[in-house]
């Protein structure tokens, strides 16, 4: 681990600050030992940790779009660049000379962990004075203490999710080196990776420690009476976007879910599944109940990604006040106006399109209404809120009720002329001819002086917990059984029937296909859950980890080491012909795991590489 670099980075903090959270080193006169003499520096240890974990780990800003780019390492998406590190990873061509992607993941998490350990060391953060009034000081430092444990748990889970795997040349399942002390760069550091099981226990322990200090949620209604009711400057929604108790229960649910999965649970210990279901249900209960005013989240309603306070949110990033990052990534170059400047960087695959069934909920392979010559007709209503395709129009949610753009992806004629403006290969357009609509519902770039809206990334939302619960509970009680107040079938049925992101009606609540699969038993229903998870969480950073944890090595290679495809469109007058078997890029993963950064392997004799990365040892 490059702890010397971590301390160098701390020195760089002298020259930078964040707009909302404080900097631990606001001027060049303060040292590491001075941090606890200044209240702004003490709080800055936590604030800067949010920064690290948001670049791009989730906590900072909407425009940190790691989650979308990670999808290009899966069968769901393809990046326009053919030399990008994430593309090389998926093609089995990633070399040690292009290791920055994994090195950045590793470094940002350990940078945050260093600062958090500094805060937690000898309980110094809890002993600090950040406010004059003792009562208020206690409120703030307790919250900061909880955040320190909670953010460390988030960083640790990110490390485990990205780097947990089987050791090269052995059989052990390993995680990351557990570090709970602020290590000194002058020390001769040579640490080893802890076992996967030990890393899970560490994450759970940090969540439990955080729960001792954090409020259940940062909501004003929790402080409407009693001696804390007049402390709204320090409690409640003023701390929105910071981790809270519900965040901790969510991290526990997601950690147990991974630990229970096939790759990391070789003996299929049911208790792990049960724990994942228990904590997911706890969050679901809280979100649905809401305040005494009856304003809880209704899971039949849509998720509004334009609403930074959407009720589905468990924990979100800080706001990006004026942002069009995802629109720029997903829209074609021709969709320009008023300095919008899109560049068509990420396109969806035919494989992902195939995950959507028909409008009645049946897979297209079993559909009575699907027509392969018209592959975009009569599809699952959710499809239309996620994918833009040839001849599809775009109408922004604000400023007009009329379409302002039509996607055109057809091939040129025999003379090489008259091709669609948005087709692959024509400038800055996606390579698959399938454009992503998710997250992009608001802006009207044709409107003079168009407004970029405040945005936030939903790090954890209700659907994460609903899907975690359904997957885990299905393994414990089956599709129709009840566990912690819910059945997997009911939870999945609600997700399928909910309003789409564009507020359109979902699959009919009757859903005969869902009923038939539920009656078929646990294994078929598990396959359905996997597909629902793929659809609902696309471009939210889960797919590669899911591909890995759901399989063993042979299954992973068989299922995913194959080409991915786009759609080739031919135009004849007003008639379009679609070929969804148009090969775009081959997938040839070296491993179901990401590699440990090569720098770390060279630096430390005890550090073991992940299976499949023989050239990185």
What are these regions (language model features)?
Residues 1-28:
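Bacterial Sec-dependent N-terminal signal peptides
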Residues 43-44, 51, 82-165, 186-219, ...:
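Conserved, well-structured interaction surfaces
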Residues 19-88, 101, 145, 164-176, ...:
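An aromatic- and glycine-enriched ligand-binding surface/loop that stacks and positions planar moieties
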Residues 217-237, 292-303, 342, 415-428, ...:
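Surface-exposed intrinsically disordered loops and tails
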Residues 17-18, 84, 109-112, 187, ...:
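Long, intrinsically disordered, low-complexity segments
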Residues 381-498:
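C-terminal substrate/ligand-recognition segments
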């Amino acid at each position: 681990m490059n702890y010397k670099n971590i301390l160098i980075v701390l020195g760089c903090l002298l020259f930078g600050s964040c707009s909302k959270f404080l900097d631990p080193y606001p001027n060049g006169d303060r040292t590491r030992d001075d941090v606890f003499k200044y209240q702004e520096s003490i709080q800055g240890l936590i604030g800067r940790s949010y920064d690290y974990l948001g670049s791009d780990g989730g906590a900072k800003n909407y425009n940190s779009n790691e989650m979308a780019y990670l999808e290009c390492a899966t069968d769901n998406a393809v990046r326009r660049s053919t030399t990008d590190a994430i593309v090389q990873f998926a093609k089995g061509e990633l070399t040690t000379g292009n290791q920055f992607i994994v090195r950045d993941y590793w470094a940002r998490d350990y940078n945050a962990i260093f600062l958090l350990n500094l805060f937690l060391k000898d309980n110094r953060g809890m002993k600090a004075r950040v406010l004059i009034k003792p009562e208020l000081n206690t409120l703030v430092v307790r919250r900061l203490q909880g955040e320190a444990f909670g953010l460390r748990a988030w960083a640790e889970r990110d490390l485990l999710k990205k780097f947990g795997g089987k050791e090269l040349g052995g059989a052990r399942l390993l995680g990351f080196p557990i570090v709970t002390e602020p290590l000194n760069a002058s020390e001769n550091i040579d640490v080893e990776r802890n076992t996967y099981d030990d890393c899970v226990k560490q994450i759970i322990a940090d969540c439990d420690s955080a729960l001792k200090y954090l409020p259940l949620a940062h909501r004003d209604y929790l402080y409407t009476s009693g001696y804390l009711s007049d402390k709204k400057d320090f409690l409640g929604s003023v701390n929105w976007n910071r981790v809270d108790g519900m965040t901790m229960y969510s991290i526990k649910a997601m950690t147990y879910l991974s630990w229970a999965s096939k790759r990391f649970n070789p003996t299929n210990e049911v208790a792990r599944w049960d724990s994942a279901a228990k904590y997911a249900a706890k969050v679901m209960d809280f979100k649905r109940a809401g305040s005494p005013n009856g304003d809880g989240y209704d899971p039949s309603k849509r998720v509004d990604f334009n609403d930074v306070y959407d009720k589905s949110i468990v924990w979100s990033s800080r706001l990006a006040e004026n942002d069009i990052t995802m629109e720029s990534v997903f829209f074609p170059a021709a969709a320009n106006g008023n300095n919008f400047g899109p560049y068509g960087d990420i396109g969806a695959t035919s494989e992902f399109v195939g995950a959507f069934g028909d409008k009645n909920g049946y897979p297209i392979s079993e559909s009575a209404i699907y027509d392969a010559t018209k592959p975009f007709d009569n599809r699952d209503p959710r499809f239309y809120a996620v994918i833009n395709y040839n001849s599809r129009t775009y109408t922004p949610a604000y400023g007009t009720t009329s379409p302002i753009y039509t996607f055109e992806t057809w091939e040129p004629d025999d003379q090489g002329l008259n091709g669609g403006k948005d087709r692959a290969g024509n400038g800055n357009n996606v390579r698959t001819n399938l454009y992503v609509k998710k997250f992009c519902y608001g802006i009207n770039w044709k409107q003079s002086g168009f407004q970029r809206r405040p945005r936030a990334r939903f790090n954890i939302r209700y659907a994460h917990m609903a899907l975690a619960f359904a997957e885990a509970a299905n393994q414990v009680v089956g599709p129709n059984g009840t566990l912690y107040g819910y059945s997997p079938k009911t939870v999945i049925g609600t997700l399928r029937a909910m309003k789409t992101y564009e507020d359109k009606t979902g699959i009919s609540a009757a859903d005969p296909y869902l009923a038939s699969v539920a009656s078929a038993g646990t294994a078929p229903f598990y396959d359905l859950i996997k597909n629902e998870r793929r659809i609902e969480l696309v471009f939210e950073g889960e797919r590669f980890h899911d591909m890995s944890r759901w399989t063993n090595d042979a299954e992973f290679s068989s299922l995913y080491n194959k080409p991915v495809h786009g759609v080739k469109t031919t135009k004849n007058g007003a008639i379009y012909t679609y070929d969804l078997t148009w090969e775009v890029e081959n997938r040839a993963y070296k491993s179901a795991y990401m590699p440990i950064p090569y720098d770390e392997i060279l630096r430390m004799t005890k550090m073991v590489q992940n299976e499949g990365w023989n050239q990185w040892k």
